[in-house]
Amino acid sequence: KNGDLRTPVITIFDARGCKDHANKEYTGPKAGGADDEMCVKVAMQKIAVAEDAAALVLKECLSELKARKK
């Protein structure tokens, strides 16, 4: 019904001071400081929508908006 719904998913990697493993999340050029051990990943991921839950949220939101309008 809603097609291919996608949303941005943000993941933050902070490996400052971590010596347990080699950090391979970032493969670009090094900055030469603490920033070399941090990375932010943004990816669009498919999401599943529970139609019954979505309908309930919509109903509650509309009810709240109508109550505020009075």
From Swiss-Prot:
The keyword Thylakoid applies. GO terms for biological process: photosynthesis. It is found in: Plastid, Chloroplast thylakoid membrane. It comes from Chroomonas sp. Belongs to the phycoerythrin family. Contains one phycocyanobilin chromophore, one mesobiliverdin chromophore and one 15,16-dihydrobiliverdin chromophore with binding mediated by both the alpha and beta subunits. This is Phycocyanin-645 alpha-2 chain. Keywords: Bile pigment, Chloroplast, Chromophore, Electron transport, Membrane, Photosynthesis, Plastid, Thylakoid, Transport. It is a peripheral membrane protein. Mesobiliverdin binds at C18, Y26, K41. Transmembrane segments: none annotated. (2R,3E)-phycocyanobilin binds at R16. The keyword Nucleotide-binding does not apply. Pfam families: Phycoerythr_ab. Its main location: plastid. Light-harvesting photosynthetic tetrapyrrole chromophore-protein from the phycobiliprotein complex.
